Amino acid sequence: MRIFVDTGAWIAIADRNDQYAKIASQFYTDLIHQRRNLITSDLILVETFNLLSRTIGSKTTVKFGNVLKTNAFLIIEPITPLDWERGWKIFDKYDDKDFSFTDCTSFALMERLKINSAFTFDIHFKQYGFYVFP
């Protein structure tokens, strides 16, 4: 099984003071032990690193990023121009849901890669129709 990893999950894994830190770290450890393929996007990591730099500092964020780079189970997918366009259509269509554009590009990527599950604490993934964990 492949699972998409969203910004909130990465933040909770990296920041021990995050409200979801304990549950996120345990779930992440379980995924690694189960040898699950983790998929995330370049936009998710940009968002993650920007937010983490403000909360845990740049130095710790860089260390976290370097750990991610060595994770054999992590695939960082670039958002393609088609994902961007599909994301915009989702963003436009569901303007009543308060989805972020980053969420919408994630939905587009997940549709393209046929991934139906997300490691996230963001209710928007469930609202759009994906299974969410933990």
Where are the language model's segments positioned?
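Short acidic, glycine/proline-enriched helix-loop-strand junctions
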Residues: 68-80, 94-96, 126-134
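Active-site neighborhoods of divalent-metal-dependent phosphate/nucleic-acid chemistry enzymes
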Residues: 75-116
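Amphipathic alpha-helical segments within well-ordered protein domains
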Residues: 8, 46-50, 88
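Short glycine/serine- and small hydrophobic-enriched flexible loop segments
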Residues: 50-53, 111
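A generic structural signal for short hydrophobic patches within well-formed alpha-helices
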Residues: 10, 45, 125-126
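Acidic active-site catalytic centers that drive phospho-/nucleotidyl reactions
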Residues: 6, 47, 103, 122
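Acidic, PIN/NYN-like endoribonuclease modules and their adjacent C-terminal/linker elements
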Residues: 107-108, 112-134
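Short, well-structured N-terminal submotif of metal-dependent ribonuclease cores
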Residues: 1-40, 53-67, 134
